[in-house]
Amino acid sequence: MAVAIPISLRFFLYYTMNRFAKRFIFHYLAKSLNRKERNVMKKLIALTLSLCLLLALAACAPNQNTTGGDANDYLSKIPAIEDLTETDTSKIIGLEDGILTVGMECAYAPYNWTQMDDSNGAVPISNVPGAYANGYDVMIAKRICEAYGWELEIVSSAWDSLTPAVQAQTMDANIAGQSMTADRMAEVDMAGPYYYATIVCVTTKDSKYANAKSIADLAGGKCTSQSGTIWYDSCLSQIEGAELLAPAETAPNMIMQLQTGSVDFICTDMPTAMGAVALDDNLVILNFSGTDGDFQFASEAERAENVNLGISVLKGNEDLKNAIDKVLSAMTEEHFNILMDQAIAIQPEI
């Protein structure tokens, strides 16, 4: 009988192996190799790690069940995609070839994840042979490309490499659950919002924090979040006496730290929390939004800036930003929520 391994653990094992390869194998073995031999070794290790990722995900079948009715019922609840194929987009930076190259982690359910087939409309990951990406971000990317008749290419990237990739023009856009912060928008332009998020915490049902009604009730707790996020950089520090651990490299790693008892609670956004709870009924969401006990920002405008999610494009690429915004403008917050509910319904099972 096969043993089900949580997807968070599978990705943790992959990233651990990746770090080991870079820091141990290269350090101790590469010294005796010349440059050509080192390049060959790097390619072999990269291939091996990709195969390890595929094997780690092999047992992770996408959930083919939905919240009820036909699998495509949700499409009747959102606007049809406007036909914009007559629009000349050949002069848009990066779109000269008609291909929109989109970066995402492919490890951040329900926004994006990796699966082993094209079920539920998944799209091949160009730099991970045999693997496919799906999730809310993929759904949004497909709507944009369908509107203009563009071909969609999805590239898997580490979180911290997403913005530099857009700046270097190796990606045309990032659709990856990125907040529209002032710091990020100083580096790239952002279309959107393409999702209106809420900041929440997640803990276990048997935790002493399970009945927390405000961030004050989380005082003294051990916690973490994902690196490079507003949740880690600005929210957790508002909890009095909190023991803040090093940030997790990925969302699955963050969730696994909670599941294994390394932390008392994590801070994330509502979709990530909902996705985690859907796969692990021992987790519970702590939502303080709309109360005096919520995380604080200088103004509601600043809250929106730090919570709402946008699509990164090259600084100054107004044509691409405007093209994406035209597609997004046809949808409301309710429509985005319907799409997100569908993504949660089909995300990989444990």
Give residue ranges: language-model regions.
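Short, Lys/Arg-enriched N-terminal segments with co-localized hydrophobic residues
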Residues: P6-V40
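Sec-dependent signal peptide recognition
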Residues: K42-S50
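C-terminal motif of bacterial Sec signal peptides marking the signal peptidase cleavage site
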Residues: A56-A59
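Extended ligand-binding regions for polar small-molecule ligands
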Residues: A61-L84, I140-A147, D206-Y209, G220-K222, ...
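Extracytoplasmic small-molecule ligand-binding "clamshell" domains
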Residues: T67-Q178
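Bilobed "Venus flytrap"/periplasmic-binding protein-like clamshell domains
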Residues: C106-A109, G130-E146, Q178-S179, T198-I255, ...
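Acidic, polar ligand-binding/catalytic clefts
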Residues: K142, E146, E151-D217, T291, ...
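Alpha-to-beta junction loops
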Residues: W150-E151, Q167-A176, G221-C223, Q259-T272, ...
